[in-house]
């Protein structure tokens, strides 16, 4: 996400778009008919994209106003070889948050939630290490990701466990000290929407899942949308992890404690129902999702600008280790796109994501120029990474094999070779140090990298630790031999 433009989006572009959507007005200059051969163009784009990149399967839905223009599945859904169809169930990952936000706005419209009230109004036991800070966080702070709870805290192991209860997670959060004052800075965190799920339960008097079914999924006729464990859904899409540039089946876990932040399952067909509500006054087939006197549904901070000043678009993506989903909205054209994909290409090497794919499909739908995703950066990036890891493995094995009687070999070498040997030792120790701090480059920790990219993290961490250990052993042996023989270290 482009954080620098977030405030501009929220305070200028988004309110303007909200007015357009809620009043139902459309700029007359924009054509209201789909381009000719839309399905053929989308099919060509998707098939070529899948040919270029290791994408096992995906589903696409395109709407214009209240009409579905294109709805199609491509490729394979799972290890059983089931084809992807518009009715294939996919984990939505963080797209779940958009539904949770809608539920909060519904309750705000009915007076059961006040966005400016403190979270402790609804969850009295909510605490942080800084008790004063905990009293300042509002429901709006959770919606807008301005609570001060960090991205890293939202990926802690206790939120990745299939057995953690909400009470256990809340007790763990009580030990956390927030990074910045509530309401002052945007930082995306799953914790915000975990808490909102509980706020919905407390304010509505119903379990979160029951409220969502009655007030969102049923009115939208989203009959295949569920919070049930995706493993229990026949024919559901299963994830595929990119391992060294190759797609490998991966069994994505179902984590009940984070259900309101990322564990809704839906289909492309159901999601087109959801998209049409964005362009029809918040209604679907005469069913109103929002109270007319309540706050708008669209003024939440997780929508981001992905267009140009004269052609605004908003989108939101979701992703687990092996799943990637996205919705794109072009309000001035009343065009919406949903992409559900059973792999994720951008977790390690910068590669095409569903953001890019959905954005280009939307441009096809409004008859704008578009680009096919490039695979050059993806495959060249993995080639470099795989080559580097292979070289480091060879170096570690070679150094370990020479470790026996290494001190004697060192003393028999020329001065130049000794200097080169020291350069090698320093290099090994630097690799070790870089590996230790590398996750900080992504503002994360090693346990998160190990969870999301074990194919990369395990060999890199192993290599780093081995080279560091070898370097320390050599330094120790050289020091001991120097003292023993009274010889200059070089």
Locate predicted features.
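Bacterial N-terminal signal peptides that target proteins for export
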Residues: 2-14
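Sec-dependent signal peptide cleavage junction
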Residues: 26-32
């Amino acid at each position: 996400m482009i954080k620098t433009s977030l405030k501009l989006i929220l305070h200028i572009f988004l309110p303007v778009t909200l007015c357009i959507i809620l009043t139902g007005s459309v700029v007359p200059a924009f054509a209201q008919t789909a381009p000719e051969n839309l399905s053929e163009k989308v099919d060509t784009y998707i098939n070529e994209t899948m040919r270029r990149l290791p994408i096992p399967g995906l589903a696409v839905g395109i709407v214009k106003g209240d009409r579905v223009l294109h709805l199609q599945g491509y490729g394979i859904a799972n290890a059983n070889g089931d084809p992807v169809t518009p009715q294939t169930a996919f984990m939505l990952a963080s797209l779940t948050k958009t539904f949770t936000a809608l539920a909060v706005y519904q309750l705000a419209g009915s007076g059961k939630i006040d966005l400016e009230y403190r979270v402790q109004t609804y969850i009295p036991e909510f605490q942080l290490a800084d008790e004063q800070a905990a009293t300042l966080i509002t429901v709006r702070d959770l919606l807008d990701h301005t609570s001060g709870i960090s991205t890293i805290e939202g990926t802690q192991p206790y939120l990745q466990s299939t057995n953690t209860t909400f009470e256990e997670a809340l007790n763990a959060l009580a030990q956390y000290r927030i990074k910045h004052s509530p309401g002052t800075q945007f930082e995306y965190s799953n914790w915000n929407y975990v808490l909102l799920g509980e706020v919905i339960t407390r304010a509505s008097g119903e379990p979160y899942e029951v409220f969502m079914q009655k007030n969102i999924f049923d009115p939208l006729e989203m009959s295949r949308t569920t919070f049930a464990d995706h493993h229990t859904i026949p024919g559901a899409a299963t994830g595929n992890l990119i391992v060294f540039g190759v797609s490998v089946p991966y069994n994505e876990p179902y984590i009940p404690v984070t259900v309101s932040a990322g564990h809704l399952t839906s289909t492309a067909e159901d999601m087109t129902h959801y998209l049409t509500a964005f362009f029809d006054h918040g209604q679907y087939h005469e069913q109103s999702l929002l109270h007319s006197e309540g706050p708008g549904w669209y003024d939440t901070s997780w929508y981001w600008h992905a267009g140009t000043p004269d052609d605004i678009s908003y989108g939101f993506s979701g992703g687990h280790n092996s799943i990637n989903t996205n919705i794109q909205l072009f309000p001035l054209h009343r065009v919406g796109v949903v992409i559900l994909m059973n792999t994720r290409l951008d977790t390690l090497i910068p590669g095409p994501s569903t953001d890019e794919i959905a954005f280009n499909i939307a441009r096809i739908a409004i008859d704008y120029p578009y680009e096919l995703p490039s695979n050059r950066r993806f495959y060249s990036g993995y080639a470099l990474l795989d080559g580097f890891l292979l070289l480091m493995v060879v170096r570690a094995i070679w150094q370990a094999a020479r470790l026996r009687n290494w001190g004697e070999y060192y003393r028999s070498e020329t001065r130049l070779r000794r200097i080169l040997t020291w350069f090698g030792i320093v290099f090994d120790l630097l690799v070790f140090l870089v590996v230790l701090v590398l996750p900080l480059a992504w503002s994360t920790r090693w346990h998160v990298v190990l969870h999301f990219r074990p194919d990369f993290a395990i060999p890199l961490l192993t290599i780093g630790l081995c080279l560091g250990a070898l370097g320390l052993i050599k330094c120790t042996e050289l020091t001991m031999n120097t003292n023993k023989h009274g010889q200059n270290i070089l």
